[in-house]
Amino acid sequence: KIVEIGCGKGYFTELLEKRGFKNIYGFDPAYEGDNPNITKDYFSEKYKSINADLVILRHVLEHIEKPYEFLTHIQNATSKDTKILIEVPDFEWIVENRAFWDIFYEHCNYFDATFLSSFFKNATSKKVFGTQYLLMLASLDELRKPYVKHRYQKNIFKESFRNIKDFLSQNTPLVLWGGASKGVTLLNIFDKNRQLVEYCIDINPKKQNKFIHFGKDI
């Protein structure tokens, strides 16, 4: 039995089914489909038993304010033999690529390989998606309180900010390509007065002819 917590629209659960896996379940309050195996709710301590062989968290843990407590709820609802597969953005990649747009309000926590692995006594991890994400497999019965060791400089994005500000000071017409979280984060930082960007381009038809929260046309 596989349970994906935070399964979104159910794409990954459907992919697993197509690959031949059986007994796949999910949790997500935003799910809009009609799969009876997906519970339209947040997973919480009220779910006492999910009896899973594998629990999957794909791009969920970085949105959880208290990740250790959340993992404890999952541990309490499963057996000692349950495995957990976690995928999160890799903070080391963010730092190396100066990808400051990947730091935004929806992410409560950031993980590198050392920090993520510290949640468990033993864990196997690797970098995926061009080293942008971390994928880790562990046993839930080996969950432990993590330790944090800060090893990053405070001003790692300072030079990137300076270069962008220098470019923006040229007063050339600008268009935002992509009206999702990264584009909005860019505007939050560099266009607080809503004067630099004329409009936004986005491939999502549900966004077109509407506005992002800055009042810019899409």
Language-model segment annotations:
Residues 2-98, 105-121, 138-140, 184, ...:
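Conserved SAM-binding loop
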Residues 57, 113, 131-132, 194:
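Alpha-helix initiation and N-capping motif
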Residues 102-104, 151-152:
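Short, contiguous strand/loop micro-motifs
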Residues 109, 127, 179:
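Aromatic-acidic/polar surface patches that form glycan- and anion
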Residues 122-133:
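Conserved S-adenosyl-L-methionine
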Residues 134-218:
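Hydrophobic, well-ordered beta-alpha structural blocks that scaffold small-molecule cofactor pockets
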